[in-house]
Amino acid sequence: MSTADHSTINSACTSTSGKDQSYLLKLCGSHKVSYQPNSDWDCYVDDAQKPIDMDLILPHYRARYQPINHRMNMFVGTEAGPVKLKICRSFSRSKFYLEVQASMSDVTLYLPSDFKGRIHHVGKAKFSSGFVNRVMQNVYFTDSDDEGSESEDCVVVVTNGTIMFRMWDVQTCAPENPQKETFKRMFGCSKKAPETTIDWDFLLEG
């Protein structure tokens, strides 16, 4: 995976045609991610100033001519606006690679509850109760931006702002319920989070 050209200030996703063309994406709302055989990125969003608040919906099927071991590759970049992304997945075999370059912006990521793979981040990270309860046990944090194996999920986040990791529930197809997950955490109804070597704060939500 080559590093995206961060000097590009637009919001675009490469089309599947053989022509060198793109179509604009809305920076808010839902977007269905689809296999793009002629691009390094299956979804590419880069905007200098505007806030980004998107639900990226991963496919529940393999597209025609899509390699069996292909990970959906997504890039989101901004220079100043806050970033909020929900990675929505209903089929756990649809693995993904997500890279977020956010300069000084705060980033909120909702990762699917069946996430399994690695996370590399530059910036102070916080974790919601839902993330700790349902996701943390299947995550290992790395000091490098190695993309890892195609058979696992991978997230890379670089920002000088704050990163908030939250959980998107694959069973309810909705973001975590903060009150419910906080009660689970308080009364010990969830598995203990593994120790990590990173500096993180536990977020108690009311």
What do these predicted regions represent?
Residues 1-206:
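Intrinsically disordered, low-complexity terminal regions
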